């Protein structure tokens, strides 16, 4: 078993553009022209190939590119008892584009069961070697909590949970169980992807909650509570990190706003080992909130964008790293893209060649800064 621990000086979030043969196989499966077994064979081949490419690129963390899921978050939720989903033709409005998502809601109490993602991890783990370690990405507990209390789901959720605190308790316990399942399968590096903090930054979110008669500080407290509850009893030798961004769908974003208003919660109090933070443009604000990061955490600066094909200016990125250094020591900093390349199957509006060029730039800059 590899003993390497994330994050690394140059790192990435997790998802990669789906190769054409995988897209074709999934389409054929949906049309009924190939079997699940045939789709699994193609998926296994594509995962094997993407891992090999990560190694060739010189990266130490390896992921399965999230090739086995449609959405970065919803598919994982479907692996719990009490959760169902359906294609309802709905979606979530991003900046200039409607994200085509599947309705995901409760049909009972949330409970853990043998989670299919653990088997997905086992397939990935076989590729570990002395230079690499398998990292698995799942949505944060707060993301699942938020999914069940959105306006279109809250009435259904109240059939099973009279209060948010009861829902938080069950989600936290279910995650504790699944984390132990990952650990038993040999996972020592788990990443919790979390858009909930990014969704409540800025004045727009504050005004939205005020109009609903909800104290936004109570919202922040609940997000922190469910995330930390899930981490209670975690194995001591398991690294658990959190990636925070403001939405990433087909090169569009969901929200904008600086981290200032949530730093006292997630930066200071969330019990993770590192934070992978979106910082690729002005929407994320400045680096001053990094001063609130507790001393036991590392920070991975997401300064390279996956939303646009153009390569960043190396000197400007290096300058931004040193700007961040004013608030947190350089030895606790790392570098990565701001998010994945394909948070959902549709992927961002870049090519595979541009994807690898972005990662080559991340590595080049990191090796120069932390030489």
Q: What positions do the PLM features span?
A:
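Domain-level signal for soluble alpha/beta catalytic cores
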Residues: 1-371
